[in-house]
């Protein structure tokens, strides 16, 4: 049997987005024991605003919602440099390949069909958060800025890294090149 994933999610916050109050109540209660904070949004517009204001560590969202659906939410988050690093898991009753492909094309990190088990959702969440932490540690320990084509996760990430690399290359000889300058 594979080793159990023991990644601790208790220091993290999660944003749950769904227009079904019964499901959000269930998820808030179920996920509350695993997370420091569980925030609820009833549609993509509210979720995008909460994400920009509070930057949750991970987002779990329904696809079919009023005002802004889950695909549009993914796209909005992944195009915003300030929050594009936040993993998004889509939950939906739509299990056809076209729906899944649309989710991934718009930036979803994972796609889970309803009905689902909390244990399955938690494993996906743990894996995504653990991967993010591993990437952070790798770059903090090495001090290297990754080349965009090696480890880009979104278009916004790639744009940021290209701009950062260009600034560093253009000012490499400058005595003013430091963190404040960048």
Regions inferred by a protein language model and the residue ranges of each:
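Receiver (REC) domain active-site loop signature in two-component systems and cognate sites
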Residues: 65
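Active-site beta3 strand of CheY-like receiver
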Residues: 54-60
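Charged docking surfaces used in two-component/phosphorelay signaling
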Residues: 25-33
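C-terminal output helix
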Residues: 116-125, 137
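Short hydrophobic/Thr-rich beta-strand motif most characteristic of the beta2 strand and flanking loop
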Residues: 35-42, 50
